[in-house]
């Protein structure tokens, strides 16, 4: 399982546009083979900071999303006019713990 962590700080005047783009792209994710889930968060301590956490079956699924033309257009707009800063981290999940079993599962 792959986690993609997108951390960004939107320029104050463009934060609403980011949220609009994110809402427009979200339905397209369901069409990507290997997409599992996505959640978006807004920092309580850093004004304008947002985080998007998405889960994918494997790196190939992440590549398919990265190649989506609508996603590419949104990325270009984000780089050009929305974000003052962004960082993307891609991580492989090696283990999962749950409160239900108290045990971990190697993934």
Residue spans for each PLM region:
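Short S/T/G/P-rich N-terminal loop/turn motif that feeds into the first structured element of a domain
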Residues: 1-50, 57-67, 83-107
């Amino acid at each position: 399982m792959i986690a993609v962590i997108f951390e960004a700080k939107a320029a104050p005047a463009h934060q609403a546009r980011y949220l609009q783009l994110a809402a427009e792209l979200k339905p397209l994710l369901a069409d990507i083979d290997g997409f599992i889930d996505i959640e978006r968060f807004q920092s309580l301590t850093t004004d304008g900071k947002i985080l998007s956490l998405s889960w994918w079956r494997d790196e190939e699924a992440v590549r398919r999303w990265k190649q989506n033309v609508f996603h590419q257009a949104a990325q270009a707009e984000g780089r050009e006019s929305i974000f003052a800063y962004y960082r993307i981290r891609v991580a492989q999940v090696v283990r999962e713990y749950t409160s239900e079993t108290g045990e971990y599962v190697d993934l």
